[in-house]
C-alpha cells in the first residue's frame, strides 16, 4: 500500500488492481488500520464506475483520463472500455465495503457504496444468461475477462482434471 493497492512492483503492474484489493482487504484490515486507505480507494472505484455499472479492473483508472486510442500498438493493450466488468475485479465494490464493516463496524461505508453495489449487480444481471453469469462460447463477447487460471475457450460442460485437483 502506498497511495493505492498495487499488484506487484517488480512487473510494472503498479496500478490499483481492484481484484487484488478485494482479495487482500480483509487481511489488510487485520494487519493494520486500513479503514481510511480502503475508503479512499472505494471512492476512486466509484468515480471510475462505468455508466453501465461495470467496475474497472484498476482504479484510479488512467484510461478514463487518457484513453488508449490505438489497440494495435504493443503499449496499448486494449481500448479503455475493455478494462472493466470482470467478475472478481468488479466484486471489489461489494467485498471491500463488507470487509470494512466486519472489521470496523463501519455501516457508513455500506451506505455510501450501496448505489454503486446495485449498479454493479445490475450490470452482472444484464450480461448474465438467465440466473447464471457464464462465459459465452466466444471469448470476450460479454466484455473482457481475465480467466487467469481457467481455459477461456472450449467445451466447459465436461470437467477435466487440472494440476491443482489433488491439492484440495
How should each PLM-predicted stretch be described?
Residues 3-72, 103-166:
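Active-site acid/base region of carbohydrate-active enzymes
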Residues 99:
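Short, solvent-exposed loop/beta-turn-alpha elements that line the ligand-binding surface or hinge
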Residues 86:
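Cofactor-binding catalytic cores of oxidoreductases
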Residues 75-82:
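Conserved, well-structured interaction surfaces
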